[in-house]
Amino acid sequence: VKDSSYNLYEHLKIDNFSILPGSESKLLKGLELGCAGIITATCNVTAGLSRKVYDDFIEKKEPTKNKMLCDVRNAFEKFNLISGLHSFMSDEDEIYKNVLPPVSLLNEKDKIQLINELNKLNFTLGSSKVV
């Protein structure tokens, strides 16, 4: 089950039942608590980073990409997540400009702010690809 409230993943423990926090910022702690991973809209662009954090946890390595993963998520959280995702991805493929109400694309000022924040993190669609 997806836990967007962040109330379950720390407390609910049922055999053969997976809790998936709904934010990249909860991935590492969730894994430490026995969660199977995350389920989040922004994972469409953070999958590579999320996978690296997951793999490092499984392999008992230092989570070298967790801060960047959380920083990217935080950049998107400053706006409506779906609007931010579609606005970000629309530079690569115009199909992402198609959204249904009540969702809309970010206004130009907010889109520039989001892109600038992601650029400061050296995060691009190219860098987000799962290898």
Where in the sequence are the language-model features?
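Catalytic alpha/beta core domains of metabolic enzymes, predominantly
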Residues: 2-79
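A structural signal for alpha-helix termini and helix-coil/disorder junctions
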Residues: 56-59, 75-78, 91-94, 120-124
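Residue-level marker for well-ordered alpha-helical positions
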Residues: 24-25, 83, 112
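Conserved short secondary-structure transition element at the edge of the structured enzyme core
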Residues: 31-32, 68-104
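Conserved, mostly hydrophobic/aromatic
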Residues: 1, 30, 85, 114
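Flexible C-terminal active-site loop/helix
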Residues: 94-128
